[in-house]
């Protein structure tokens, strides 16, 4: 922040909203000025994630990640001064409306300098929209870039002002799935399960989603249409897949929906050779809840202990980060662990490089110029499919039985050859 007190003029965005909406006068600017010029200045980071509700698996490792990086965030040097990064976390309750509400609270009441979010479009999009409306620097992950960008009505030639995202895209997951399915003993007939939500509408989109590239690759896709999340009856979809002779089932589902579908599929005699589902099959707890019917299911793999990347914050390898979580929690590692950690790697890097931490525009400029290596791979917003987006590598694999339990094994890496394969896909 500049010494002449211009922080009270953070544009006609955030401050004007604060004064109009909350009836605050100069106090917020004074408080921020005091924070910035204190002997041990603090940057406040708002953090939104689904701690409760059907997406809670994505936030399972939150406490571990924040505790493990607390020391690293307690002293980050910027322009010769040591800054402390204070993280204020709020629960979206797996509800996009609630995500927007808590994001607004973080921005307008807690006066955060940066806001971050992860875990599907239901969290990422409403948080990003609140940040964009208020001119607040925002970094997000854990959501394919198309539902993030186009789900927010983004225009590729314009992008956004203050909101930035790193993750893979639908082109990557489609490529990984097609590579996974390339078995001559399996008919190229696919049943698609796409919910009526941001993810489902993006994955099922005729042009940007699965239908066109599957057709171009020679696959016949049966798409019975969008179903409502938390549905209790998938009989229509199962009947359509059986009639079409589908030997592959794919889509994007929340865990409760897949559990319902897979149980009813067994009861109604649907026997696909390959089942590859996005989102629902990321978590060991979900696969374990399916019993023997969980073995052999397949999914995208964003991050694993075998990924050849390390943390810029702690120096840990992917293997060390995963093992640390397992020891501390007595639970299996999960894929979001790497991305939650990387989110704060990027925050710390931005805090180090920003020319003036008292000015949102300076923080946004530092985000835009990010070019770093994280535990999930490179993050560089000068390279991306559209403005404000940069991509991370993606592979795919299968839940296989090892040592008496289900383990996620990378079985194809054509989309990211630097990530090693651990086995071959086994048909159901």
Residue ranges and their predicted role:
Residues 295, 368-428:
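Solvent-exposed, acidic/polar segments of extracytosolic/periplasmic ligand-binding ectodomains
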Residues 112-224, 274-299:
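Extracytoplasmic ligand/sensor domains, especially the bilobed periplasmic-binding protein
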Residues 1-13, 20-27:
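N-terminal secretory signal peptides
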Residues 57-64, 76-153, 227-234, 259:
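Beta-alpha junction/loop-to-helix N-cap segments that form part of ligand/metal-binding clefts
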Residues 145, 265-341, 353, 408-427:
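Extracellular/periplasmic periplasmic-binding protein-like sensory domains
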Residues 352-365:
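Short, charged, surface-exposed loops that flank catalytic or proteolytic processing sites
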Residues 29-50:
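C-terminal segment of N-terminal export signals and the immediately downstream linker at the start
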Residues 46-67, 90-96, 119-120, 193-204, ...:
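Extracytoplasmic "Venus flytrap"
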């Amino acid at each position: 922040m500049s010494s002449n007190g211009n922080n009270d003029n953070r544009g006609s965005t955030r401050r004007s909203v604060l004064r109009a909406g909350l009836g605050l006068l100069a106090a917020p600017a004074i408080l921020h000025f005091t924070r910035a010029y204190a002997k041990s200045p603090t940057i406040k980071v708002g953090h939104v994630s689904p701690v409760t509700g059907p997406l809670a698996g994505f936030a399972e490792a939150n406490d571990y990640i924040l505790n493990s990086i607390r020391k690293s965030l307690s002293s980050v040097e910027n322009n010769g001064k040591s800054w402390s990064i204070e993280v204020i976390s709020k629960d979206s309750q797996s509800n996009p409306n609630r995500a927007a509400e808590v994001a607004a609270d973080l921005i307008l009441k807690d006066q955060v300098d940066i806001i971050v979010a992860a875990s599907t479009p239901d969290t990422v999009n409403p948080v990003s929209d609140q940040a964009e409306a208020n001119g607040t620097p925002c970094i997000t992950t854990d959501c394919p870039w198309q539902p993030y960008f186009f789900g927010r009505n983004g225009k590729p030639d314009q992008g956004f002002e203050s909101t930035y995202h790193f993750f893979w895209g639908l082109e990557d997951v489609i490529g990984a799935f097609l590579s996974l399915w390339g078995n001559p003993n399996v008919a190229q007939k696919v049943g698609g399960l796409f919910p009526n939500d941001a993810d489902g509408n993006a994955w099922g989109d005729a042009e940007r989603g699965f239908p066109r590239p599957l057709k171009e690759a020679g696959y016949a896709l049966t798409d019975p249409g969008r179903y409502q999340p938390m549905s209790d009856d998938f009989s229509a979809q199962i009947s359509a897949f059986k009639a079409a002779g589908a030997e592959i089932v794919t889509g994007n589902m929340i865990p409760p929906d897949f559990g319902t579908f897979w149980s009813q599929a067994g009861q109604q005699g649907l026997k696909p050779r390959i089942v590859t589902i996005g989102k629902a099959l990321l978590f060991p707890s979900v696969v374990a809840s399916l019993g023997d019917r969980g073995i052999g299911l397949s999914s995208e793999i964003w991050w694993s202990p075998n990924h050849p990347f390390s943390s810029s914050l702690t120096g840990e390898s992917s293997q060390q980060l995963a093992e640390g979580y397992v020891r501390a929690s007595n639970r299996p590692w999960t894929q979001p662990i790497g991305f939650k950690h990387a989110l704060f790697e990027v925050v710390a890097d931005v805090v180090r490089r920003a020319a003036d931490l008292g000015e949102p525009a300076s923080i946004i400029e530092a985000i835009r110029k990010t070019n770093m290596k994280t535990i999930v791979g490179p993050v560089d917003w000068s390279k991306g499919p559209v403005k404000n987006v940069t991509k991370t590598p993606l592979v795919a694999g299968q839940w296989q039985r090892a040592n008496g339990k289900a383990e996620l094994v990378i079985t194809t890496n054509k989309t990211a050859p630097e990530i090693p394969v651990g086995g071959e896909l086994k048909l159901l």
